[in-house]
Amino acid sequence: MLPMRYKSILLAFLLFYVSLAAFAAPGTMRLDYYHTGDASHELFSVDRIVIEPLPWPGDLTKTIDDTNLGNYFFEVRDQANGRVLYSRGFSSVYGEWITTEEAKTASRTFSESLRFPVPEAPVKIVLKRRDEGEFREIWTTRIDPKDKFIDSSRPHSPGPLLTIQKSGEPATKVDLLIMGDGYTAAERTKFENDARHFTEILFTRSPFRERRADFNVWGLCPPSEESGISRPSNGIHRRSPLGTTYDTFDTERYILTPENRALRDYASYAPYEFIEILVNGATYGGGGIFNLYATVTADS
């Protein structure tokens, strides 16, 4: 039998580890859905619900977005009492496409995603759109975290995670993920150098320069079969892992990707809040969507 003092020490250790478990970060849930419509109408449908490989990277004391930014806004509400557990404002590729001439005469479908901490009980997802300065509800769906059809399988790995700058634990820092597209396996070193170069340039500019210690910067680069990305105006088409392309919305230097599903699966192997897609190419181009991602060419 253990002496009383050893029992006390053992009990203290047990309580310590139980307290750690209680404050452990929850998993990361992602709702992938389809956004369909034209300049006048839009509708939504669930694609899949997944549990990403890594724990939730965000600050659990700052789950409510009160900035009133973005063209869309979503809330995760406790289904039992309606309490808002998580919210974020964002914009989307669809939201930009509906301003084009094509949207006046045709419909298109875009893949989109909402990420949030895995809830402990059933929740209601409420999606809102900005209308005359106010967010108005346009779609709802319900999620039971115990649903057997929630996909917890691990997607195809993009390769090793590159730590470019680690200033602290993800929950206490802003996590920026730099993703390479159009880099072959043989160009992995080039991606690493390009990502580090981009990081140094970013932190020479205000307000990033003054807040550098508040950031973690990570890198992922799924290998591409061919070097470079698509540029349809020059007759160049590539099947790059992230699907980035010039000529988005028939604007020659505008680079976005329609492949949201692939982007999110690859990105799930890093803790992130913001994504910068670094395109392997020398022709000037880039773009960005609020709270979605930004793109830039590495060598321009």
Locate the predicted segments by residue:
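Fold-level signature of zinc-dependent metallopeptidase catalytic domains
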Residues: D147-A213, G219-I229, G235, T245-T248, ...
